[in-house]
């Protein structure tokens, strides 16, 4: 998918990497040469994605992480020395008619789709600007 792009010596983190778009992004980034750090709540999904990446001769590291848990997220990010690319993909939807949405569902979706997305972006961007040997300050964030 990204074979014309060279991401050698780049490190990418993908949240929600166990399925769907996150899985596809993780595999594509690995095919382009990036070292990919994959996060998901579901270990079995991460293991499957990790195997696919390894078959393509890509490099990946997996972490089971609930991004709505700030302590879990910080613990994972402490283990990462460099970060160049973030695919902030973790998210969910619980389709319901607006008049039927419970407080519990609203809080769950707000925590995952807004608060967690903010926390992931903020903490990862802090890591990006602190990276050694960076020619310019920053990195790439995809939401």
Regions found by a protein language model. Give the residues of each.
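Conserved glycine-rich Rossmann-like NAD(P)H-binding loop of the short-chain dehydrogenase/reductase
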Residues: 34-48
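Flexible N-terminal pre-Rossmann segment of NAD(P)-dependent oxidoreductases
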Residues: 1-10, 133-134
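Substrate-binding pocket helix/loop in short-chain dehydrogenase/reductase
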Residues: 97-98, 105-110
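A short, exposed helix-loop element centered on a Lys and neighboring polar residues
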Residues: 121-122
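The beta1-alpha1 cofactor-binding region of Rossmann-like NAD(H)/NADP(H)-dependent oxidoreductases
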Residues: 44, 63-75, 103
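Conserved glycine-rich cofactor-binding loop
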Residues: 11, 18-20
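Conserved NAD(P)H cofactor-binding loop of Rossmann-fold oxidoreductase domains
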Residues: 89-94
């Amino acid at each position: 998918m990204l074979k014309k792009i060279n991401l050698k010596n780049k490190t990418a983190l993908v949240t929600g990497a166990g399925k769907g778009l996150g899985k596809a992004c993780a595999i594509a980034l690995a095919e382009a040469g990036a070292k990919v750090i994959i996060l998901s709540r579901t270990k079995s999904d991460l293991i499957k994605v990790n195997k696919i990446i390894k078959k393509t001769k890509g490099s990946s590291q997996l972490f089971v992480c609930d991004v709505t848990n700030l302590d879990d997220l910080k613990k994972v990010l402490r283990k990462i020395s460099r970060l160049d690319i973030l695919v902030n993909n973790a998210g969910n939807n619980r389709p319901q008619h607006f008049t039927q949405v419970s407080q519990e569902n609203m809080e769950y979706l707000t925590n995952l789709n807004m608060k967690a997305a903010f926390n992931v972006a903020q903490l990862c961007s802090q890591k990006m600007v602190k990276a050694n040997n960076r020619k310019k300050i920053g990195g790439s964030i995809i939401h």
